[in-house]
Design a protein with these regions (language model features):
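Conserved structural position within tetratricopeptide repeats
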Residues: 80-83, 114-117, 184, 218
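Residue-level signature for tetratricopeptide repeat
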Residues: 64, 98, 132-134, 199
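Alpha-helical segment of the N-proximal tetratricopeptide repeat
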Residues: 53-80, 84, 192-199
Length: 244
């Protein structure tokens, strides 16, 4: 998935809109009543930030814990972020990944369903939704309830989606991932092996899953968010990858 660097700016805009609604409603009150309500809202935010930190600090802590292969702790911190700033939850696909590796699959499923409302064209979102549902119920049920998605032009995301939907193949994913120049191939093969490994794992083929994940984490390693997810996966599963 794409790491949205403007994450907190988007949240700030959402908060501004919500506060605008609050102000319009408050105009029907006395000036004194408005002041009390505004002060109470500000006070609640201040208390939460004193307990957990600012939204930026909480987000950074959650991500850091995740990449330290501590998804359970990471998920708890992401929960704190939602408590401090509830309007940010739809954008938090990173929380969905932490929930998956923390074995909180139903909550992960709901996170990816919510994320679709703000990011409807990212194939990785229905893929992770599938993985959560497959672990919570079964791969067959997950396939029947896959989220609809728009067009994602990244290679080999279309082929990965087809595989998860039951219409594609591992060979087709790898064939498309091996196209382009050497740098493109490395990135594409990192994604391909990550999602092939995830798919193999939820379908019970642990040996194949390990092979794919280690290729994504080592042979075709990338330092972007999803490349590092492969590393986290290997470490969480105890597949003998050194700690970063």
């Amino acid at each position: 998935m794409k790491l949205h660097s403007r994450f907190l700016n988007q949240v700030a805009t959402q908060r501004y809109v919500q506060q605008g609604v609050f102000v319009v409603t408050a105009l029907f009150l006395t000036h004194g009543g408005f002041s009390v309500l505004h002060a109470q809202e500000a006070s609640a935010i201040t208390v939460q930030e004193k307990i957990f930190g600012t939204p930026d600090q909480i987000f950074e802590k959650a991500v850091s814990l995740f990449f330290d292969a501590k998804p359970g702790e990471s998920a708890v911190v992401f929960d704190q972020l939602i408590q401090v700033q509830p309007e940010c939850q739809p954008g938090l696909w990173q929380r969905g990944l932490a929930l998956y590796y923390a074995d909180r699959f139903v909550e992960g499923q709901k996170q990816f369903e919510l994320h679709r409302t703000v990011n409807p064209n990212d194939v990785e979102n229905p893929a992770w939704h599938y993985l959560c549902v497959a672990r919570a119920t079964s791969p067959e049920n997950a396939r029947q309830h896959m989220l609809a998605v728009g067009q994602d032009l990244r290679v080999p995301m279309k082929q990965i989606l087809e595989l998860y939907q039951g219409d594609g193949s591992e060979e087709n994913v790898l064939m498309h991932a091996a196209r382009g120049d050497s740098q493109q191939q490395r990135n594409q093969l990192c994604y391909a092996h990550l999602y092939l490994g995830l798919y193999a794992e939820v379908n019970g083929n642990i040996g194949k899953a390990k092979g794919h994940i280690l290729q994504a984490a080592e042979t075709y390693s990338m330092d972007h968010y999803m490349g590092r997810v492969a590393n986290v996966h290997a470490r969480v599963r105890g597949w003998l990858l050194p700690v970063e």
